[in-house]
From Swiss-Prot:
This is Probable endonuclease 4. The gene is nfo. It comes from Campylobacter concisus (strain 13826). Its cofactor is Zn(2+). PANTHER family: APURINIC-APYRIMIDINIC ENDONUCLEASE, ENDONUCLEASE IV ENDODEOXYRIBONUCLEASE IV. It catalyses: Endonucleolytic cleavage to 5'-phosphooligonucleotide end-products.
Length: 283
């Protein structure tokens, strides 16, 4: 059984997200617990928290398979101390929001050096922020998303993600989310069985499948190594359905949330069915 869903809307309140996920036949989902493009947000009310938990239970979706996404504004690698501190506080708030909702994961983009400091200095900033966030929170696993090598964003190669994990004090509370579009844009091929085996063999050697805590299943508008973060609907981009067939049938991938962030939400229900149909029956 694969746990497949999409990054659904939480418009009108986070409690609507499980309802929106159930409507498209999902048994996993992602959401923003606040406006992802604003620094401040109202605290979640007790009523909203209880309604979210009730709706999640009614949907039949486990909290294990919900992958909330942190704000895009957060940059834990920021070269400036004050800006980095602001990002850290916002990050901790995101973790606490996930925890209040009874969720166990928080997906985030690692950070950007803004062409002002070296890659290693930026990665060290990110690692220090992760450790501080872990120290000040509990229960929620922090899931680092790979990036597309666009601009000055780090986390685009597996070695950078491993560098962060190696510097985290509590490895039990850190994981990785592979975004297929980002991986492809950064030069990791997933299309053929051979290419997939090579890419995931490298992932396992450098990071380890045990850290794989979620995936974003997105086709890519541009070709291999484009360094462009442009998602496409499944089978309509440069990755093609073969890549997703490889993922769905990879026995080394555990019971993790597999989340669509494809560009046409009106066909998410169909895309979930496509992914389920790609799963080969085990003898």
């Amino acid at each position: 059984m694969r746990y497949i869903g999409a990054h659904v809307s939480a418009a009108g309140g986070v409690s609507n997200a499980p309802i929106n996920a159930a409507k498209i036949g999902a048994n996993a989902f992602a959401l923003f617990t606040k406006n992802q493009r604003q620094w401040s947000a109202k605290e979640l009310s007790e009523g909203e928290i209880e309604q979210f938990k009730a709706n999640l239970k009614a949907s039949g979706i486990s909290a294990d398979h919900v992958l909330p996404h942190a704000s895009y504004l957060i940059n834990l690698g920021h070269p400036e101390k004050e800006a980095r501190a602001k990002s850290l506080e916002a990050f901790i708030d995101e973790i606490e929001r996930a925890s209040k909702l009874g969720l166990k994961l928080l997906n985030f983009h690692p950070g950007s050096h803004l062409k002002q400091i070296s890659q290693n200095e930026c990665l060290d900033n990110i690692a220090r922020c992760i450790n501080e966030a872990l120290k000040r929170t509990s229960g929620v696993k922090l899931v680092i998303e790979n990036t597309a090598a666009q601009g000055s964003n780090l986390g685009f190669d597996f070695a950078q993600l491993a560098y962060l994990i190696e510097r985290v004090d509590d490895e039990s509370r850190v994981g990785v989310c592979i975004d297929t579009c980002h991986a492809f844009a950064a030069g990791y091929d997933l299309r053929s069985k051979e290419a997939y085996a090579k890419t995931m063999g490298e992932f396992d050697a450098v990071i380890g499948y045990k850290f794989l805590s979620g995936m974003h299943l997105n086709d890519a508008k541009f070709g291999l190594g484009s360094k462009k973060d442009r998602h496409e609907s499944l089978g309509k981009g440069e990755l093609g359905l073969g890549a997703f067939e490889n993922i769905i049938n990879d026995d080394k991938i555990g019971e993790i949330p597999l989340i669509l962030e494809t560009i046409d939400e009106s066909i998410w229900e169909d895309e979930i069915k496509i992914l389920r149909n790609l799963e080969k029956e085990k003898l």
